[in-house]
Curated annotation (Swiss-Prot):
HAMAP family: CobQ. It comes from Acaryochloris marina (strain MBIC 11017). This is Cobyric acid synthase. Pathway: Cofactor biosynthesis; adenosylcobalamin biosynthesis. Transmembrane segments: none annotated.
Length: 497
């Protein structure tokens, strides 16, 4: 068994993509390879086939390795619920909420046990483990309780790749400063540097690279050019920074930028559609006149709903709906579209009942039980069924939510799926809500929905005979790997591999 650790000088240096690319490169060499991240903090989650919740970035890395995601790849997931509070997902299951000051006191030992147990399992099954760190490995105020970076590297005696983002400036200072703050035994594991997101000619960097290698004795094993790609973003900062302009887009879809937006990977398939422009609209921004509005998932549904209510967005959404606009709510967005959300046990915060947006006759009650499961459902909505062939009416996705939703006026809505609890549609088909994450991954249905928007503008329909998004995602993983591999020398890490 071999192991490689990928750490970064900062957050957003490109660790996740680099780890995915290394997984793909090793897979191409014929090795059994698995990704691993001991602890992730993210609001983008994925549910494995076993019903376990892990970071979505590790799911992407698993697909890069040709694997189905599993809980051992990310035994700890922290999902921020407020500035100082997170939900703790341990071995795929929610085990509680914690304050930042209490987390390491309450979970450090349990967390390290989960990490080492997962590593033992993976070591027994795979030729290579590609580990990803988090943030920076040199946060000196946190190093003594860091579960993710050099503690894992030392445990595996893993040669470590240090990735730095030159696009942010100060790349040489970041690299040297990080090395200076590492302990000697940690520094000894750093076997190469990657300068990521470089724009320009490498010759302009040569003097700096020579200086860096002479000063540190460590080679620069890669200078990676700036890449445009559509692989899922790690968090919302990445997401909003990289949105591409599409001057020739024919359909505009507004996504409400909730303060605690979660699972925004739901929209990657829409971003990949050449004819679709996505706009992320904050609660205090003008909504405008998009062709459709999506209210996405949220880690703190009630708090984000209240933000919509105190801002202008709730009124804007109601006015948009009354004017005939199409609104789709996903997971927490579905809950917000209803009449009320009650939280009698204080699952998300102070107990109480809270007014929803009132666009669907629904009532949601929060509870301590969390639903995490893969789902396969049959579309039963007549308008969708008439457009889809029988084979394309089966769609796949996953649920991650707390709370149960009831329909208050059954005559005012139609069931969207063969399981009515998964989603409903208003009788005029302009307001839709579903608990199903990943619904846009289903290519034919995505095109049916987009064609409804196109028909509003007298645009020709898009063809429905397309594969699901996972085929496109796999193609993108190949493209990104093909773009990075020529600039990345892994021999110092792989030896004879």
């Amino acid at each position: 068994m071999g192991a490689i650790m990928v750490v970064g000088t900062t957050s957003h240096a490109g660790k996740s993509i680099m780890a995915a690319v290394i997984c793909r490169m090793l897979k191409r060499k014929g090795y059994q390879v698995t990704p691993f991240k001991g602890q992730n903090m993210a609001l983008n989650a994925y549910v494995t086939n076993a019903g376990d919740e892990i970071g979505h970035a590790q799911a992407v890395q698993a697909w890069a390795a040709g694997l189905e995601p599993r809980v051992e790849m990310n035994p700890i997931l922290l999902k921020p619920q407020g500035d100082m509070t997170s939900q703790v997902i341990l071995n795929g299951k929610a085990v509680g909420r914690t304050q930042a000051a209490d987390y390491y006191r309450d979970y450090f030992d349990r967390g390290w046990q989960a990490i080492t147990t997962a590593l033992v399992t993976l070591q027994q099954e795979f030729d290579w483990i590609v580990c990803e760190g988090a943030g920076s490995p040199a946060e000196i105020n946190l190093k003594h309780r860091d579960l993710t970076n050099m503690r894992v590297a030392k445990h595996l005696n893993a040669p470590t790749l240090l990735v730095a983002d030159i696009d942010r400036g100060g790349v040489f200072a970041h690299i040297v400063g990080t090395l200076e703050l590492l302990d000697p035994d940690e520094r000894a594991l750093i076997k190469g540097f990657v300068i990521n997101k470089f724009r320009g000619q490498r010759s302009l960097l040569e003097s700096g690279i020579t200086w860096l290698e002479e000063r540190t004795g460590i080679p620069v094993v890669g200078v990676i050019p700036w890449l445009e790609h559509s692989l899922p973003a790690e968090d919302s900062l990445d997401l909003f920074e990289r949105r591409r302009t599409k001057p020739n887009a024919e359909v505009t879809i507004a996504v409400i930028r909730l303060p605690r937006i979660s699972n925004f990977t739901d929209f990657d398939p829409l971003e990949a559609e050449p004819s679709v422009r996505l706009q992320f609209v904050g609660p205090n921004q003008p909504l405008g006149q998009p062709d459709a509005v999506i209210v996405p998932g949220s880690k703190t549904t009630i708090s984000d709903l209240q933000q919509l209510q105190v801002s202008s967005m709730a009124d804007q959404l109601r006015a948009y709906s009354q004017a005939g606009g199409m609104v789709l709510g996903i997971c927490g967005g579905l809950q917000m579209l209803g009449q009320t959300i009650s939280d009698p046990m204080g699952t998300e915060g102070p107990p109480g009942e809270f007014a929803g947006l009132g666009l669907l006759p629904l009532q949601t009650t929060m509870s301590g039980d969390k639903i995490t499961r893969q789902r396969q459902a049959q579309i039963t909505l007549p308008s969708d069924c008439s457009a889809l062939g029988e084979d394309a009416r089966t769609i796949q996705g996953y649920e991650i939510h707390q709370g149960q939703t009831q329909v208050l006026q059954p005559e005012a809505v139609q069931a969207w799926f063969d399981d009515p609890a998964l989603g409903v549609v208003s009788c005029n088909h302009r307001i839709l809500g579903t608990y199903l994450h990943g619904i846009f991954n289903n290519g034919p249905w995505r095109r049916v929905w987009l064609n409804q928007l196109r028909a509003q503008k007298n645009l020709l329909p898009l063809p429905l005979a397309i594969p699901n998004y996972k085929v496109y995602r796999d193609h993108m993983l190949d493209q990104v790997t093909d773009a990075i591999a020529p600039y990345l020398n892994l021999q110092p890490f792989l030896g004879k591999a």
